[in-house]
């Protein structure tokens, strides 16, 4: 019954966040949770010293491994963003499975709400609900949690968000070129999604 209830929850893609992630991905560089589009440069050794040549060869071997890892991460990111783009305008559902400990996991491995920061940020409930009386309070607490303050008191976390109202508005109005306060979060893309809800 529990798995059925979870499987009946419709999800959708958070289009504005997906647009920002795609923009950051196309820019390359060092955006959080997105691999660089550029490989490390590998240069051939041009000297005569055998020890230096061996050291240089080991360095190049490490760089080749790093480039292979980057290639794998780029393929993974491309796949996740492609899946998100394909489902951009649709509601969809996750089937779940339970492991031997009784923990439920979504079956799709690439894009799900237990995935990376980017995966979690681009997903949202397809049937939004009003925040209710305490909803804004809890959304602010959630933002503080995304900044790594989960062990502080609820009031401290709420106050953290209140004290950063100007930063929240700046990140909401110009996330890519403003002060980019959201990048300071432990989970920056989720923080940006939360900021967009607060904005």
Each language-model region and where it sits:
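Non-catalytic nucleic-acid-binding interfaces of large nucleic-acid enzymes and RNP effectors
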Residues: 1-199
């Amino acid at each position: 019954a529990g798995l059925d209830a979870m499987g009946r929850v419709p999800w959708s893609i958070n289009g504005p966040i997906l647009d920002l992630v795609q923009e950051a991905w196309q820019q390359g560089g060092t955006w959080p949770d997105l691999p660089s589009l550029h490989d490390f440069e590998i240069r051939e050794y041009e000297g005569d010293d055998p020890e230096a040549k061996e050291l240089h060869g080991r360095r190049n071997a490490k760089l080749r491994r790093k480039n292979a890892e980057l290639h794998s991460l780029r393929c993974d990111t491309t796949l996740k963003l492609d899946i998100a783009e394909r489902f951009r305008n649709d509601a969809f559902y996750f089937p779940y499975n339970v492991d031997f400990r009784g923990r439920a996991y979504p079956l799709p491995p690439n894009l799900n709400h237990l995935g990376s920061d980017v995966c979690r940020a681009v997903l949202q409930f397809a049937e939004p609900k009003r925040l209710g009386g305490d909803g804004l309070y809890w959304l602010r607490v959630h933002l503080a949690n995304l900044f790594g303050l989960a062990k502080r008191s609820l009031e401290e976390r709420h106050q953290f968000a209140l004290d950063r109202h100007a930063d929240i508005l700046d990140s909401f109005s110009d996330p890519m070129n403003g002060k980019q306060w959201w990048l300071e979060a432990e989970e920056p893309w989720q923080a940006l999604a939360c900021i967009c809800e607060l904005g």
